[in-house]
């Protein structure tokens, strides 16, 4: 998986604490949930014409959405329902313009649902009283009624064969006791159960089939009927689904590698294949397109694409931009399908963290712009904050949105008309009846889509600056494409600093006595962006009094920690601006936790056996704040009152590499509040990346410390974490695991 064939070494983490409710097998009768009257009308079904998804009248339909995982995992229910409310989350998605949700499931779950056997769901019914007493299928179908209420559509994605938080790591659509025939059976059951409910509009046949020429098993794409030919499997599964429900869209992803001209699939040469992301290689469509016969008009191809924080692909290791990514990666792997009018595309997964690597931000902005410019459908990865290498649109509390990620990356790709987000339901506006942010596809005019950008704003002027702000005004743009001007983007140089629906904006956070250049662009309801206005330059005021920040605190040291506190000391700062140092700001990570006036402070309220990082800034009487000190890291002491522990360790390996899943269970009678799992590699293995915990390796010793969202394990509760690594031929499992210095039982 980390081979020279440019495979994506990510194991994009779908893992979470199981801790509010233990998973207990319940034998329960299958309980049907009646579909509302609107769901039976069938007027929201979609099909394709050329490279465009359209509704039953032939009107363009752009699927603009997000992924929400959990039903694919061991919990078998949406993650986050241990703290977030299902109704509020769903309504917020709709109000923010998300008109479709891709829901990962497993074949194992579909077969369990078919058999009427359920696990007790991991749901906090205090936060979700509406889910009291419901099994996982009933929760899913209750959520479908919420989607109907708020105008959201859904499609299912078989993410893995087994109900496993790391199940997507396995290369194929089968695994263990789950066979290819089982996958067909699961899809046929789903197509039958929801054939009359147009809330569910499609099926993503299998998530990210992958594997390289060095893999024991790998997914290929050719014209054979071989067991490992994903093209044949996807074609067969799609035909079985469409024989039951001919109205569903079927989404077919790519594989990982494709042979260069003249190279057979039997070759193991490292340079014999084109490689890209799991699910992102659709080169085979040119030679071996999916053939669905009479149902060809239900086919959508669905590649995945990620940035360098997921894996540092070779195209990120040189200077790149949207043009080079299009020419080198997107074009030959999948964009040709859209550009040559073969079929529509839906980018099934894309997204990631912002502000950690400029290359990551550049990649995401480039793909964002491609999606908006080509009017592509997409489902952003991901709503969940507990996706280890991408983060989510929601923060760890499952209530607060990452406004920067949403507004700068996802929102510009959402389908808009006349300044409102467009839903795929013909009766219900996106956001529900009375929505002020959304409209219905039935309210959007048919005919040729609006691809005309607004006029560039004119008359940009700067008002009177202060030492840190510049007010801007301009004349309104016009739009002849039919969707109307929806707002404006304000740029400082090439940096987007704000958006507004008005023709004025005040830029803040500027440095005193400094020159800045500003420009403005208009956007219309279809997402088209104008050329930039003529630029205007303004200089901020010089300011008065002390504008010099104190020196940076030095010598930050952590004393002996307890289970809940850490004492800190540092050397005093100096101030040459004249107002003098008045105090300090102490930060835990990026969170301000105290403002002492002296050069010491004890941080309290911490979790036991947990790693923390602290920094200090100095503040003077004029309000100037220094840069942060060098950080100091410290791990709190174990809590002697925590319970016992048990660990299950399983690894999947290949030549030179492996992935491991680790389940930590609190077997004690009191909650485990903050934990660090420790073990040693016995065979010289090397950790490369991990998820759902903060991983570190020193020599052979490895530690995994809880994330904020899985810090507390109730008695009997478990958390699933994992990592990938390399080995030199021997991959012996660790023999001993410890938490807080105590040895865990190994299962």
Curated annotation (Swiss-Prot):
Q: Which InterPro entries match?
A: CBD2 (IPR001919), CBM2/CBM3_carb-bd_dom_sf (IPR008965), CBM2_carb-bd_dom_sf (IPR012291), FN3_dom (IPR003961), FN3_sf (IPR036116), Glyco_hydro_5 (IPR001547), Glyco_hydro_5_CS (IPR018087), Glycoside_hydrolase_SF (IPR017853)
- Which keywords are on file for this protein? Carbohydrate metabolism, Cellulose degradation, Glycosidase, Hydrolase, Polysaccharide degradation, Repeat, Signal
The protein's matches in PROSITE patterns, at most eight in alphabetical order, are given as: CBM2, FN3, GLYCOSYL_HYDROL_F5
**What SMART domains does this protein map onto?**
CBD_II, FN3
Disulfide pairs? Answer: none
Q: What is its EC number?
A: 3.2.1.4
Report the residue ranges that make up the CBM2 domain in this protein: 638-747
Question: What are the start and end residues of every segment in region (Disordered)?
Answer: 456-475
Its signal peptide is 1-39
Pathway per its UniProt entry is:
Glycan metabolism; cellulose degradation
Question: Where does this protein have compositionally biased stretches of type Polar residues?
Answer: 465-475
Alphabetically, the GO molecular function entries are: cellulase activity; polysaccharide binding
Q: Where is the Fibronectin type-III domain?
A: 456-543, 552-639
Active-site positions on this chain: 208 (proton donor), 349 (nucleophile)
Q: Which reaction does it catalyse?
A: Endohydrolysis of (1->4)-beta-D-glucosidic linkages in cellulose, lichenin and cereal beta-D-glucans
A biological process from GO: cellulose catabolic process
Kindly give the PANTHER family that the UniProt entry links to this protein. ENDOGLUCANASE (PTHR35923:SF2), MAJOR EXTRACELLULAR ENDOGLUCANASE (PTHR35923)
What family is this? Answer: Belongs to the glycosyl hydrolase 5 (cellulase A) family.
Q: What is this protein called?
A: Endoglucanase D
């Amino acid at each position: 998986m980390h081979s020279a064939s440019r495979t994506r070494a990510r194991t994009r983490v779908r893992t979470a604490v199981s801790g509010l409710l233990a998973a207990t097998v319940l034998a329960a009768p299958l309980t049907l949930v009646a579909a509302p009257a609107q769901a039976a009308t069938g007027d929201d079904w979609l099909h394709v014409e050329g490279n465009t998804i359209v509704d039953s009248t032939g009107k363009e339909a752009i699927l603009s959405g997000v992924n929400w995982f959990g039903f694919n995992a061991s919990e078998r229910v949406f993650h986050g329902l241990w703290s977030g409310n299902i109704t509020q989350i769903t309504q917020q998605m709709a109000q923010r313009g998300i008109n479709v949700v891709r829901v990962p499931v497993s074949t194992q779950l579909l077969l369990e649902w078919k058999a009427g056997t359920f696990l007790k769901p991991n749901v906090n019914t205090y936060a979700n009283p509406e889910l009291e007493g419901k099994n996982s299928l009933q929760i899913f179908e209750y959520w479908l009624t919420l989607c109907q209420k708020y105008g959201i559509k859904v499609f299912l994605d078989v993410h893995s064969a087994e109900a496993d938080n790391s199940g997507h790591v396995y290369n194929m659509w089968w695994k263990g006791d789950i066979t290819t025939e089982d996958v067909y059976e699961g899809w046929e059951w789903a197509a039958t159960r929801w054939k009359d409910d147009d809330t569910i509009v499609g099926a993503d046949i299998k998530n990210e089939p992958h594997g390289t020429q060095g893999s024991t098993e790998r997914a290929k794409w050719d014209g054979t009927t071989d067991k490992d030919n994903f093209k044949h499997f996807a074609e067969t599964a799609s035909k079985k689904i469409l024989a039951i429900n001919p109205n569903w869209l079927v989404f077919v992803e790519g594989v990982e590698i494709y042979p260069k001209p003249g190279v057979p699939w039997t070759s193991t040469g490292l340079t014999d294949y084109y490689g890209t992301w799991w699910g992102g290689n659709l080169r085979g469509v040119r030679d071996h397109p999916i053939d669905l016969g009479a149902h060809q008009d239900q086919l959508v191809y669905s590649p995945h694409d990620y940035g360098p924080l997921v894996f540092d692909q070779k195209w990120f290791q040189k200077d790149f931009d949207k043009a080079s990514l299009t020419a080198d990666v997107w074009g030959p792997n999948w964009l040709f399908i859209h550009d040559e009018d073969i079929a529509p595309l839906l980018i099934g997964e894309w997204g990631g963290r912002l502000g950690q690597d400029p290359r990551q931000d550049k990649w995401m902005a480039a793909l964002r712009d491609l999606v908006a410019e080509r009017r592509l459908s997409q489902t952003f990865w991901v709503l969940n904050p507990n996706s280890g290498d991408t983060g989510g649109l929601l923060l760890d509390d499952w209530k607060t949105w990452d406004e920067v990620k949403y507004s700068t990356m996802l929102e510009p790709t959402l389908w808009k008309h006349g300044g409102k987000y467009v839903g795929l339901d013909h009766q219900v506006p996106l956001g529900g009846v009375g929505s002020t942010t959304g409209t219905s596809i039935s309210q959007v005019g048919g005919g040729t889509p609006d691809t005309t950008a607004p006029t560039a704003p004119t008359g940009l002027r700067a008002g009177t600056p202060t030492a840190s702000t510049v007010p801007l005004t301009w004349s309104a743009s016009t739009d002849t494409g039919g969707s109307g001007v929806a707002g404006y983007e304000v740029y400082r140089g090439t940096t987007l600093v704000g958006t507004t629906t008005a023709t004025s904006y005040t830029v803040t956070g500027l440095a005193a006595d400094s020159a800045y250049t500003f420009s403005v662009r208009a956007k219309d309801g279809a997402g088209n962006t104008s050329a930039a206005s003529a630029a205007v330059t303004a200089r901020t005021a010089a300011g008065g009094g002390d504008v010099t920040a104190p020196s940076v605190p030095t010598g930050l040291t952590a004393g002996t920690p307890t289970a809940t506190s850490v004492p800190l000391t540092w050397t005093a700062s100096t101030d040459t601006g004249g107002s003098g140092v008045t105090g300090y700001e102490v930060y835990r990570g990026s969170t301000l936790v105290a403002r002492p006036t002296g050069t010491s402070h004890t941080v309290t309220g911490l979790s036991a056996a947990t790693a923390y990082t602290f920094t200090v800034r100095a503040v003077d009487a004029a309000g100037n704040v220094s840069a942060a000190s060098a950080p100091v890291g410290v791990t709190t002491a174990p809590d002697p009152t925590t319970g016992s522990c048990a660990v299950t360790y399983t690894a999947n390996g290949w030549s030179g590499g492996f992935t491991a899943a680790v389940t930590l269970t609190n077997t004690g009678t009191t909650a485990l509040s903050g934990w660090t799992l420790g073990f040693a590699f016995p065979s010289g293995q090397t950790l490369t990346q991990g998820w759902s915990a903060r991983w570190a390796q020193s020599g052979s010793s490895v530690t995994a410390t809880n994330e904020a969202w899985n810090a507390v394990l109730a008695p009997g509760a478990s958390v699933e974490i994992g990592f990938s690594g390399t080995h030199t031929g021997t991959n012996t499992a660790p023999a001993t695991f410890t938490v807080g210095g105590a040895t865990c039982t190994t299962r």
